[in-house]
UniProtKB/Swiss-Prot annotation:
Keywords associated with the record: Cell membrane, Disulfide bond, G-protein coupled receptor, Glycoprotein, Lipoprotein, Membrane, Palmitate, Receptor, Transducer, Transmembrane, Transmembrane helix
Disordered: annotated segments: 252-280
Cytoplasmic side: 68-77, 138-157, 235-321, 382-436
Lipidation (S-palmitoyl cysteine): C395
Organism the protein comes from: Mus musculus
Primary residence: membrane
Residue numbers on the Extracellular membrane side: 1-41, 105-115, 179-210, 343-357
Gene that specifies this protein: Cckar
One GO term of the biological process aspect: neuron migration
Name of the protein this chain belongs to: Cholecystokinin receptor type A
Length: 436
């Protein structure tokens, strides 16, 4: 049972030739043939169990790593921690209370559980969506507006934003505990069962509510994320082009001057951060200081710019791929259920006819997968998170200090190197103190 997937029904629970019931806010067919019913139930249990276990294990692991590993406590990871909590909440308060009543054809948990679970599920979906938006805006500020965003890119500000998203979500979803109730119905064997139903007083209110949810939980967040990640991708591509041109220019200058290319050993020290790992930049070695002291200011900056080009190029391409996956999977997981909700609110009969049975089960399952793919996208695909996982659990193979050396993260004490990814901001890069 999922609040966002509440396929609301105002009419009767029976529509020939197949009796349609809204059990636990899910459409199902009451008179399916026995072999087909058993086969579908087996597949449903298998898929639900797999997604449930993956979500619980993945999000629990994310929460554990982010809490126990001090170097993982960045601004971005604070949002990821909130996202993991909301995804875990969605899994725990959604999937069992959808699957079990679907199999039993009866909501057996009582009215209090019906109201509580609908409320928690609606809140978890809302928090997840708002966290995704907050992460996209935070990444936009860190990558596209690094100097301006430093004013508000702090852990305390992130905690305030997270607290606001949770409070706002709990407030928005207050209609669910108010209007969620158990509705009795008679099954084919003349036994009385219950459905957990979210019913507003009128069709107009239902349509308005579904339109409201469609806007604030899908359309508006989707547009914001597409725009934010689109601008980030554009900025990264500009940075890649700038890196390539700077590398070529620096190489030509070294060849023409007959100099030896120093600074190559420090390439990894200037690798751009993705915000998921916190690593102090090591002080320059004595040889590097001597090389820098014998060069002009412009030469130092050129070497710094060019030395990290290869590493930056790889890191930026990896970030772009991850951002594309984030946006695509967000729409893939949530577009079907939001579309079904709107269809259900405006054309109940047609929605019942086309969505009952397997289609709605697949749509619901697709929306549930969002709770398990987020840890994979944001953390498990990230090298720094894997290093944090290994540091948190000593039983895992330790990659050694070389695994984290030179991977500079986002520091908020002003001692790290801050550089924009675009050609317009490279001149602001400092190796001593943050720009003001």
């Amino acid at each position: 049972m999922d609040v966002v997937d509440s396929l609301l029904m105002n009419g009767s629970n029976i529509t020939p030739p197949c009796e349609l019931g809204l059990e636990n806010e899910t459409l199902f067919c009451l008179d399916q043939p026995q072999p087909s019913k058993e086969w579908q139930s087996a597949v449903q249990i298998l898929l639900y169990s797999f997604i449930f276990l993956l979500s619980v294990l993945g999000n629990t692991l994310v929460i554990t790593v982010l809490i126990r590993n001090k170097r993982m406590r960045t601004v971005t990871n604070i949002f990821l921690l909130s996202l993991a909590v909301s995804d875990l909440m969605l899994c725990l308060f959604c999937m069992p209370f959808n699957l079990i009543p679907n199999l039993l054809k009866d909501f057996i948990f009582g009215s209090a559980v019906c109201k509580t679970t609908t409320y928690f599920m609606g809140t978890s979906v809302s928090v997840s969506t708002f966290n995704l938006v907050a992460i996209s805006l935070e990444r936009y500020g860190a990558i596209c507006r690094p100097l301006q965003s430093r004013v508000w890119q702090t852990k305390s500000h992130a905690l305030k934003v997270i607290a606001a998203t949770w409070c706002l979500s709990f407030t928005i979803m207050t209609p669910y505990p108010i209007y969620s109730n158990l509705v009795p119905f008679t099954k084919n064997n003349n036994q009385t069962a219950n459905m957990c139903r979210f019913l507003l007083p009128s069709d107009a209110m239902q349509q308005s509510w579904q339109t409201f949810l469609l806007l604030i939980l899908f359309l508006i967040p989707g547009v914001v994320m597409v725009v934010a990640y689109g601008l980030i991708s554009l900025e990264l591509y500009q940075g890649i082009k700038f890196d390539a041109s700077q590398k070529k220019s620096a190489k030509e200058k070294r060849l023409s001057s007959g100099g030896g290319g120093g600074g190559g050993s420090s390439s990894s020290r200037y690798e751009d951060s993705d915000g998921c790992y916190l690593q102090k930049s090591r002080p320059p070695r004595k040889l590097e200081l001597q090389q820098l002291s014998t060069s002009s200011s412009g030469g130092r900056i050129n070497r710094i710019r060019s030395s990290g080009s290869a590493a930056n190029l790889i890191a930026k391409k990896r970030v772009i791929r991850m951002l594309i996956v984030i946006v695509v999977l967000f729409f893939l997981c949530w577009m079907p259920i939001f579309s079904a909700n709107a269809w259900r609110a405006y054309d109940t009969v047609s929605a019942e006819k086309h969505l009952s049975g397997t289609p709605i089960s697949f749509i619901l399952l697709l929306s549930y997968t969002s709770s398990c793919v987020n840890p994979i996208i944001y953390c498990f695909m990230n090298k720094r998170f894997r290093l944090g996982f290994m540091a948190t659990f000593p039983c895992c193979p330790n990659p050694g200090p070389t695994g984290v050396r030179g991977e500079v993260g986002e520091e908020e004490d002003g001692r790290t190197i801050r550089a924009s990814l675009s050609r317009y901001s490279y001149s602001h890069m400092s190796t001593s103190a943050p720009p003001h």
